[in-house]
């Protein structure tokens, strides 16, 4: 049995710069990983079967991104003659990241499966090839595949590696799940934030265009942010529902965590520019 990190991410900022004819929104965002997340346990099989041993409530196994990623890699590697005969896997997950939380849990799971099975099956696909596969599963999957903090543009697929400060974060989940379409379909969502260079953006105060909508539509998010803002700069990650506050030291973050209200599910983690998944491969 092998064990593989599936880390969370934060959007340190997120700006919506437009909307394409196909309905997808264009954006500029800054991804950084956390040293916290799910863990995937993978045991290779020799009969070509993919088994997910820990089903997710409300999600059929064949619809789960873990299974979809495994089957996609199997298909592409087989078609290109790079899949050893009988390659399969038993996969289980220790789930720590909430669904609909804006921490990238499902995308991270898919990326970990692609990277881990490519290694375990010895398929030999490059990171570029894996990232291309990942994009067909979700816009956030490539950044997890590539494994480095990044400035993202387009619909999130154009990635430029960056090295923002690795701060400590208190991340709080207010107990609601926010489906991404709920935010992106809101008529009041800002959709015309001017594009700026990464150098300019890094010098500005960070914010998230989705935050005003999430706070308006979900009182739990509004309450969580109102509480966090009493202690430190805080904002929404992704389309929510998780919010985070940044600190210079772990001790400062933990002092605030000790005061968290009971209705908040919160944890402290360090921002890291190299994904824990890729540290595992070094």
Swiss-Prot record:
GO terms for biological process: isopentenyl diphosphate biosynthetic process, methylerythritol 4-phosphate pathway; terpenoid biosynthetic process. It catalyses: 4-CDP-2-C-methyl-D-erythritol + ATP = 4-CDP-2-C-methyl-D-erythritol 2-phosphate + ADP + H(+). It is an enzyme of class 2 (transferase). Its EC number is 2.7.1.148. The keyword Glycoprotein does not apply. Keywords: ATP-binding, Isoprene biosynthesis, Kinase, Nucleotide-binding, Transferase. GO terms for molecular function: 4-(cytidine 5'-diphospho)-2-C-methyl-D-erythritol kinase activity; ATP binding. Pathway: Isoprenoid biosynthesis; isopentenyl diphosphate biosynthesis via DXP pathway; isopentenyl diphosphate from 1-deoxy-D-xylulose 5-phosphate: step 3/6. InterPro entries: GHMP_kinase_C_dom, GHMP_kinase_C_sf, GHMP_kinase_N_dom, IspE, Ribosomal_Su5_D2-typ_SF, Ribsml_uS5_D2-typ_fold_subgr. ATP binds at residues 98-108. The active site is at residues 9, 140. Catalyzes the phosphorylation of the position 2 hydroxy group of 4-diphosphocytidyl-2C-methyl-D-erythritol. Homodimer. Belongs to the GHMP kinase family. IspE subfamily. PANTHER family: 4-DIPHOSPHOCYTIDYL-2-C-METHYL-D-ERYTHRITOL KINASE, CHLOROPLASTIC (PTHR43527:SF2). This is 4-diphosphocytidyl-2-C-methyl-D-erythritol kinase. The gene is ispE.
